[in-house]
């Protein structure tokens, strides 16, 4: 890894769109969204990083992404991963190296079609929960849509798709579920 963009307070401040736009503007292939109370321990000599703290780190791989910022804006083929505390990934290609979670794909816990929408009326508001509970740990779902509406009434649709390369891992610590989700 020679470079990448970092954004902080990522999930709490809903900065996915901001990081994607910055990556498109700068041509950066990799983006790192670090949640509150979370750090990323980088070991350049080992080409690896580990998530520390209470939150997750969101990895964006725009190697094959296509952008169009007309009306409506479009970002396609952007790969997203969410890495839980304690898990490690390789810096050069953002591949998961190890996780304490149990694999979910192929042995999904949930089997109900998730509600497509946005806002406080939906469960699983955090990105790791949405992608974990509603997509990769759910055998009734291959696509998840989330809608955001601004004060002017403009709607942003985020469409997440489970591919053959997607993987999910779950673990529980006390009353908190942790999901690691890749691609």
Task: Mark where each language-model region is.
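C-terminal and late-domain segments of enzyme folds
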Residues: 1-183
């Amino acid at each position: 890894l020679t470079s990448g963009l970092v954004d902080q307070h990522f999930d709490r401040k809903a900065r996915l769109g901001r990081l994607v736009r910055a990556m498109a503007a700068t041509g950066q292939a990799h983006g790192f969204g670090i949640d509150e109370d979370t750090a990323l321990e980088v070991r350049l000599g080992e080409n690896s990083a580990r998530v520390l703290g209470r939150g997750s780190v969101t990895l964006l791989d725009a190697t094959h992404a296509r952008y169009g910022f007309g009306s409506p804006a479009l970002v396609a083929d952007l790969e997203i991963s969410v890495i839980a505390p304690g898990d490690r990934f390789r810096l050069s290609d953002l591949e998961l190296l190890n996780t304490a979670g149990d694999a979910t794909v192929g042995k999904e816990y949930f089997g109900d079609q998730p509600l497509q929408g946005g806002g406080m009326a939906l469960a699983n508001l955090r990105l790791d929960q949405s992608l974990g509970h509603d997509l990769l740990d759910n055998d009734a779902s291959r696509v998840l849509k989330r809608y955001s509406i601004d004060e002017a009434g403009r709607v942003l649709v985020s469409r997440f798709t489970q591919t053959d390369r997607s993987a999910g891992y779950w673990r529980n610590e006390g009353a908190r579920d942790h999901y690691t989700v890749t691609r």
